[in-house]
Structures are given as structure tokens and as C-alpha cells.
């Protein structure tokens, strides 16, 4: 049955990201070999070690699933699979390099392009966020819900200050508490557990940055869309997403009122 399959996949993901996360935890605070995949896009030997361990743990258990990971060559065979593992071995690599405890190990399963199981693990703070389709979201095994905040003014948003303060906005944003975290998956998870009310990113992202947080926020009662209010679909031939906004339902709509008609470059 799908529900049992989704829950089994969630349990597998939480086990895998915890075990692979131990590799990142052991290397945290050291100086791993580091290079740039592209300008401003660093990767470390630890990213690759975590990726290899996740690949072993997950595909040994689910050999029929597709695979999409930031640190693996993209295999187009994933496009033929109903269920696909989507992985970010270390989301927030720069924070990891700088010894900031704001990185996460992320894994999700999609079914026909929709997330059905997810786990986001911060091995330094020992926060395990998880969800399965229709079964709710949890932080360290305890159910979580998004905040019920409905007003932007006075709310808590994870967003780049230069975005919220950009002069091109037709309307100035009201006073809010603005925060930041290196890992976008971590930002989404913090919305899911109501530490923040919303998260907005208007820069291009990859599927592996977003997909686990998408399910966790939704299962915590929130909404996840692009800036135009459209749901996100995964396992696409080009796994890029133009923008993402997540929040509780009421404040999400208030954000969309400001973003729905903007033109992104």
C-alpha cells in the first residue's frame, strides 16, 4: 500500500541521513580537501564521502529507484522511474567549511514527481526533521506544525536582506524579523516547526535543495510554491527551480500578493 511504502521510505531515509551525517559530524571543524565545481560553488571530500554512503545505504535497500544527487553525475534513467531518491549530501557546504552549524544532510523520495518521504538532518544540532505523505511531519520524532501567523508585520521570515529591501518592490515590505541560515533545506524545516513563519528565495535552486523541505512543510500544514503560487514538480529533465516560498497558509497568501506578478531575471 502507498502509505506503508511511504512510511517505510521515510524510516529508511532517516536512518541513512543519520548514519551518513556522522561522517559530516566527524569532519566538522577540520579542514577537508576543498575545491570549486564552479565559481562560488565549493565542494569538499566530505560531501563526496557522505554522498557515497547515502548511495550505498539507499540504493542497496531500493535498487529499483532512480537517483538524483548534487554530487553524482545525472543519470537520465531516473526519468523512467516512478520513484526517485533525491539527495543533497551536504546542503550548506560553505557553512560546513566555515565551521558554522547550519548545514544539513537531505534525502527525499519522489513518486511521479511529487515528494512522498523526506528527511533533513543537522548532525551538529542533532535535529532530525522527517515526513511521509499523509502521515504528518516530525522533529526528533515529535509532531510539528507551522505557525498560525497571518500578518506579515511582526512576522519572522528567512530571506536575504538585500531581497526584502530591494527598491524594485512595488510595495515596501512591513517591519519583520528577518533571519538567515546557510542551508535552504534547514530554512524550510525551521518554518515547518514554527521557529520561523515563512521562507522566501527568489534565486534559482536545484531540486535537491528543496524537495525534502517541500514535503516536511506541507505535512506540517504549510504551503510550498514558487513565487507565482504554482506547486513545484520534481524529477524534471533539468532539475532547476526558479523560486520557492514556504509558510503557513494565511501568511503564504499574503506573501504571494506581493510576489505573484513580479518578473524574475
Task: Please provide the spans of the model-predicted regions.
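Short loop/edge segments at beta-strand edges and connector loops
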Residues: 69-71, 141, 182, 228
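Residue-level signal for inorganic ion chemistry
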Residues: 24-27, 47, 58, 93, ...
